[in-house]
């Protein structure tokens, strides 16, 4: 049999362990707040204005949907048939874009990273930056630098997306063979392999008003 001292010790051990056993898990940090939600979802549930978005949660829209998120002074917006997952980073947010269209507006001294098809887009300088990104296919992006230049990084290559331009960007993980000199009949030693092919598209139209951000 247990001695009174042994029983008392066992009881104390049980009481000490109770707070840990029944402790409420630490909630994930809030990333942002929904400012617009029409035919939209937060994770698998219908979204509405005022909902908090927590670390690692997904946002999405239906065919005619629209959704806006405020993350401090950063604004994000999705148009129809779009989806993304949000994460906190130092001074801003990281967006894992999965499909559709994304618009973002980021003031100076804030940080936005958009990860799409294994490419990473971010402001090229510490300044107000507004941009629109579309996933066209699993290898093609359309990027509009509405205000401020963007830096595009894909594997070990980088490109600057110039302000005021729209580009169609083809990403080739194996590298596309290209002539460096541009002359027909160049010998094989003058060929290089680039993983990023950029084509200039149409001019930019749109901004905060078009995307319904206030």
Placement of each model-derived feature along the sequence:
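Bacterial N-terminal signal peptides that target proteins for export
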Residues: 1-8
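Flexible, surface-exposed loop/linker segments and immediately adjacent secondary-structure boundaries
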Residues: 24-190, 201-206, 210-211
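Bacterial N-terminal signal peptides
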Residues: 9-19
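Short amphipathic, positively biased membrane-proximal segments
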Residues: 4, 190-193
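Alpha-helical transmembrane segments of integral membrane proteins
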Residues: 193-199
